[in-house]
């Protein structure tokens, strides 16, 4: 199976299955000399891990990360970093009824036709469980970006089902299980999710991710554009069905006089481009928006077929997120960090000595 690696100079390969003994990631290309320990990685894993509220899957995994290689005396050595997370709460018996059938909306049918074999336990390799090592690797990338360039990456939920969440305060995001930037709307979100669980149904979400403190110049035209690689990475996140950069699809209804971000000596006027022009970072905030579909595993019986092609009904049991978007924020942050780190190293390799007389203007004019 190919397609398990993200990045060129800072590459991450994940491994494992949902109900296997362990999952993990190998980072290749991390610069040497950066202080790194499990304590630098664990906080982001704790933000993503299951069982943290009644609104997510009740699978209980500690998601404790182990650094097996690439670090000596507390510093990265420049050699591959292997991160391991052991699975401890598998309940494979919950999937006995789907061995011979295909769950609607899942990868069961496509994996079976492509490989002629599939691991039905928790979705195997296609499970969102495999986002844990992505978050672990992303924490390493976040640390390097922060220390080397002052780049910070933060995300939040802007919509849960039909409920739009007005942005009020970044400080509210870590204080609730929805990663919502608005404490006033939490009771409505709680009530909404409680009713959804009672109905045995699921719902989608919209996630926003922002990178601040960006320098100018990261990105490679034409087919390795920074925005293209961001979209590529984000579409690798389970359940993502749409990615917007900056104004995104709203650009369709804008006029050029509105959409084009003017430049002044004092800074940019607007950021409809989402911090990227011609596939290269402008020095403004990079803004990304993700559309996440409803969880496919629901208790409502659904029509499907079995391996013989005969009609059947599938009712999913087990422990599942009624909205996978609730835990998606730290994953999206990690993916953005991985792409930015890769492009930072690529820029340094080819254009690190380039200097121009034109000053870099402020990301936002006063």
UniProtKB/Swiss-Prot annotation:
SUPFAM superfamilies given in the database record: Chorismate synthase, AroC
Domain of life, per lineage: Bacteria
Binding site for NADP(+): 48, 54
A GO biological process held by the record: aromatic amino acid family biosynthetic process
Enzymatic reactions: 5-O-(1-carboxyvinyl)-3-phosphoshikimate = chorismate + phosphate
Cofactor details (free text): Reduced FMN (FMNH(2)).
Protein name: Chorismate synthase
Lineage, highest ranks first: Bacteria, Pseudomonadati, Pseudomonadota, Betaproteobacteria, Burkholderiales
């Amino acid at each position: 199976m190919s397609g398990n690696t993200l990045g060129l100079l800072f590459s991450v390969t994940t491994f494992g299955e949902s109900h296997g003994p362990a999952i993990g990631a190998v980072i290749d290309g991390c610069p040497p000399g950066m202080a790194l320990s499990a304590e630098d990685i664990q906080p982001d894993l704790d933000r993503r891990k299951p069982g943290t509220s009644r609104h997510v899957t009740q699978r209980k995994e500690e998601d404790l990360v182990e650094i097996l290689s690439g670090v000596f005396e507390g510093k990265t050595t420049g050699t591959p970093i292997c991160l391991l997370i052991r699975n401890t709460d598998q309940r494979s018996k919950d999937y006995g009824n789907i061995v011979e059938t295909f769950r609607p909306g899942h990868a069961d049918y496509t994996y079976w036709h492509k490989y002629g074999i599939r691991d039905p336990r928790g979705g195997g390799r296609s499970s969102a469980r495999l986002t844990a090592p992505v978050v672990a690797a992303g924490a390493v990338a976040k640390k390097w970006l922060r220390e080397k360039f002052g780049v910070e990456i933060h995300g939040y939920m802007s919509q849960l089902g039909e409920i739009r969440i007005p942005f009020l305060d970044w400080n509210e995001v870590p204080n609730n299980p929805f990663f919502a930037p608005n404490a006033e709307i939490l009771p409505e979100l709680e009530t909404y999710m409680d009713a959804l669980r009672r109905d045995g149904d699921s719902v989608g979400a919209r996630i926003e991710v922002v990178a601040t403190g960006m320098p100018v110049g990261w990105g490679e035209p034409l087919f390795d554009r920074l925005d293209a690689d961001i979209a590529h990475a984000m579409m690798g996140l389970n359940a993502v069905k749409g990615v917007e950069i900056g104004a995104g699809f709203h650009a369709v209804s804008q006029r050029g006089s509105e959409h084009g971000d003017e430049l002044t000596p004092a800074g940019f006027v607007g950021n409809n481009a989402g911090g990227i022009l011609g596939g290269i970072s402008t020095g403004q905030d990079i803004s990304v928006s993700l559309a996440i579909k409803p969880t496919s595993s629901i208790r409502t019986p659904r029509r499907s077929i079995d391996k013989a092609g005969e009609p059947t009904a599938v009712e999913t049991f087990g422990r599942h997120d009624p909205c996978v978007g609730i835990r998606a924020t730290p994953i999206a942050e990690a993916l953005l960090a991985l792409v930015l780190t890769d492009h930072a190293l690529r820029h340094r390799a080819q254009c690190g000595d380039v200097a121009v007389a034109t000053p870099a203007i402020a990301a936002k004019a006063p």
